[in-house]
């Protein structure tokens, strides 16, 4: 089911400008209280109503779900599709889900619901073929060889240049002779590769951290450039004990990657273009936070 872009407000440019001003005025204290409060989000009234009315039927499989069906990747009956925001992304997103990952606990489905034209979800061992594309595809995952987003273009360019060197080896010709021959034909190696490195696709892993090694060590992903979001912190309510707060949930990783890519690589001011990726996540975050707060108050209430 395609999600309608019609819910994107016509005054989005004005709203985005207001969001920028609001975010710039954000203080450290309020950020720690609610790190998601300054997002530029579509109205969540539809989620409030759905939460009050309870679980609803998936129109595809008939299952009873809250907000959306995590197996069919569609909103349920009491969450009209036209009231869900549609997010346009600058890159294609591939999510590789561990087979033992619990569907109902995963945030990967949020990305598919909100950016259906740009996001695909695969269940391991099903992985797309990336051979020959390692100069335009990166894997977001922390590790000793991982780089920061601001260095992505530099490392992709190095891979392009490396492929050019491989071409000389394949032709079994001395490099100088190869360059001279190409110049005579009016062809330049860099031009054949394009004006510069262009990232086209980003791969994310949807799994508990204890299960990720099986996927990251797969030979089909081993050659991809690894990128780490080193400065972002999670506010996921299922954060795994013993792991640093820089280990993000899947939807957080996708969102923060795109924001940092927009600023560091595209060199453009961020005006909330991708905030609606956290449409479901931010609502559930506040819902769970309030439930926990109410539970704590109930425990503190004196018994007479």
Curated annotation (Swiss-Prot):
It catalyses: a uridine in tRNA + S-adenosyl-L-methionine = a 3-[(3S)-3-amino-3-carboxypropyl]uridine in tRNA + S-methyl-5'-thioadenosine + H(+). It is found in: Nucleus. A motif (DXTW) lies at residues 206-209. It comes from the Eukaryota. Its main location: nucleus. Residues 15-30 have a biased composition (Polar residues). Its EC number is 2.5.1.25. It is an enzyme of class 2 (transferase). Coiled coil: none annotated. Keywords: Nucleus, S-adenosyl-L-methionine, Transferase, tRNA processing. One of its GO terms (molecular function) is tRNA-uridine aminocarboxypropyltransferase activity. InterPro entries: DTW, tRNA_Mod/Golgi_Maint. GO terms for biological process: tRNA modification. Pfam families: DTW. GO terms for cellular component: nucleus. Residues 1-30 are annotated as: Disordered. PANTHER family: NATURAL KILLER CELL-SPECIFIC ANTIGEN KLIP1, TRNA-URIDINE AMINOCARBOXYPROPYLTRANSFERASE 1. Belongs to the TDD superfamily. DTWD1 family. Catalyzes the formation of 3-(3-amino-3-carboxypropyl)uridine (acp3U) at position 20 in the D-loop of several cytoplasmic tRNAs (acp3U(20)). This is tRNA-uridine aminocarboxypropyltransferase 1. The gene is Dtwd1.
